[in-house]
Each structure stands twice: as C-alpha cells, then as structure tokens.
C-alpha cells in the first residue's frame, strides 16, 4: 500500500515475481509479524510454482557466491535426518549459541514443506497468549524474534521444550 509506484514500475522491469502484501494491522515485537506474513505469502507463491526448496533472506543479508544455493542443497543431502517426517533448515548463526532456540532468520534454506512449517502464519501477540500462556520470558529466555519463531516451529513438530542450553545444543 505504501510502496511508491515509481519503485514498483522499476521492479516489474526486472523479470521477477513481485509479491505485494497488505501489512498486518499489528506489526508485533520488532516487526516480526511483517516478516512472518511476507514470508508465508512467498512460500504460498513457491508452492504454486511447485518449487522443492526455498531460500529465505532478510533485506540486510547479501549472498555473493553464485554456487551458494547448490552448496546448501548438497548439505541437506549429505546430512539427512534419520526419519521421513522432517528435513533440516540451514541457517546462519549470529550469536545464538548461548541463547536457547535462537535459530537465525537472516538466511535460511530448506525443503519447502519444512520452511512452510517454520514460517506458519500466526502472530506474535496471539501466540504469546495461546501457546506461551501470556509469558514473554521463560526461564530467563525472551520469547521474541528468532526464539519465538524457532520455539513455535519446534512446538509444531511436537517437540517438548525445556528452555535450557543443554536442550538447544
């Protein structure tokens, strides 16, 4: 709604699929609802195109290697999960080692089904009430940003969260 027409016109000339979304009314903690909504809409577009894999970046991420996506796909093939239910999501790490459930959201790569489950559309303030019993901090861990996304994903996988580093490692 608020993108200048001149910008839209220049983007349409690039031979890309341009997805325009209406912004959610509530942006959520640190605009997390904007990221969830736009990513969920992009995943739906990818499903319609019958894509098998998805790379998701934030606007503050740049990938310069022309072989990087092939590298990511090869990593998934070299390190499979031992069950038929799930696959891995490749992610960047930016200080998440000592913060439980902080899988980076700057770059992610995975099978479309897995990425769809991770980015399942729901909104932070609703989930804080429903899933986390109104708690915004659990065992000294803030339920925000990447931690919110990762724990929501793990809960969808029926994983029992312990909210400690041992469980995360």
Placement of each model-derived feature along the sequence:
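Conserved glycosyltransferase catalytic-site signature
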Residues: 32-40, 61, 142-147
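Short, Asp-centered acidic motifs that coordinate Mg2+ and/or phosphate
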Residues: 17, 53, 88-89
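Short beta-strand-to-loop acidic/aromatic patch adjacent to the donor-nucleotide binding site
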Residues: 51-62
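Short, aromatic/basic amphipathic alpha-helical patches
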Residues: 4-15, 68-75, 153
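Histidine-centered beta-alpha loop that forms part of the nucleotide-sugar donor binding/catalytic region
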Residues: 23, 58-59, 92-95
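Active-site-proximal specificity loops/subdomain of glycosyltransferases
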Residues: 1-49
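Catalytic core and acceptor-binding pocket of nucleotide-sugar-dependent glycosyltransferases
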Residues: 63-69, 76-169
């Amino acid at each position: 709604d608020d993108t200048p027409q001149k910008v839209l016109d220049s983007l349409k000339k690039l031979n890309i699929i341009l997805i325009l979304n209406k912004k959610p009314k509530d942006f959520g903690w640190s605009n997390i609802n904007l990221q969830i909504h736009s990513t969920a809409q992009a995943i739906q577009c990818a499903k319609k195109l019958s894509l098998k894999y998805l790379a998701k970046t934030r606007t503050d991420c740049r990938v310069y290697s022309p072989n990087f996506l092939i590298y990511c796909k090869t990593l998934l093939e070299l390190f499979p999960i031992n069950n038929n239910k799930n696959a891995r999501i490749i992610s960047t790490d930016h200080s998440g080692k000592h913060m439980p459930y902080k899988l980076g959201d700057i770059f992610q790569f995975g099978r479309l089904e897995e990425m769809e489950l991770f980015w399942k559309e729901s909104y932070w303030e609703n989930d804080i009430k429903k899933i986390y019993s109104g708690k915004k901090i659990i065992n000294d861990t803030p339920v925000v940003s990447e931690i919110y996304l990762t724990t929501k994903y793990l809960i969808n996988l029926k994983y029992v969260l312990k909210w400690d580093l041992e469980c995360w490692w």
